Amino acid sequence: HEHRGFAGTLSLPPQLLLDLVLAVGTDLAAAGFQRLVLLNGHGGQIALLEVAARQLHAAQPALAVLPCFLWRGPEGISQRIPEPERQRGLHAGLAETSLMLHLAENLVGPGRQADGPDQEPPEGWSLEGQAPCAWLTRELSSSGVIGDPAGASAELGQALFEALVEGWRRRFQSLLNSDWPPGSRRC
């Protein structure tokens, strides 16, 4: 719900997502699936999908449930994004805008101004990461942009895209080559 109040935003109650993951996962387990990867690209759903994964696995112990966040995982992604954008660029900032310039440039508007406050969370805290603060988009931005998209480019977007695809491909291949979850028997 952190983006509520901005045009085009649809927000679903958190319980609905939990119930949906549990229902779909239960049916997949009944159909014989042994693994379910929840690949998420929205930072506001990281913790919720981790809870959903744990609940689903508790209800269906034979189903390995792996909640993944697009930007966490592939090595080298964060190094391609300069500071302070690495910490601040959470929504329509440099990285996301660059990706969109690479994938669908016609959907990116010409004016890319950052309008969020310069104030940082207290020392030791962050907007996301190891010690996240709860926040709402309207507290950080009047436009919905959190970060600075001004330096975005299709070239950076292509580099990020290729690194994300290759990084996740390697990670999924590793999963396929494994016997995960522990104690499972595979044919």
Give the location of each predicted region.
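Extended, histidine- and acidic-residue-enriched regions that form the cofactor-binding/catalytic faces
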Residues: 1-37, 43-187
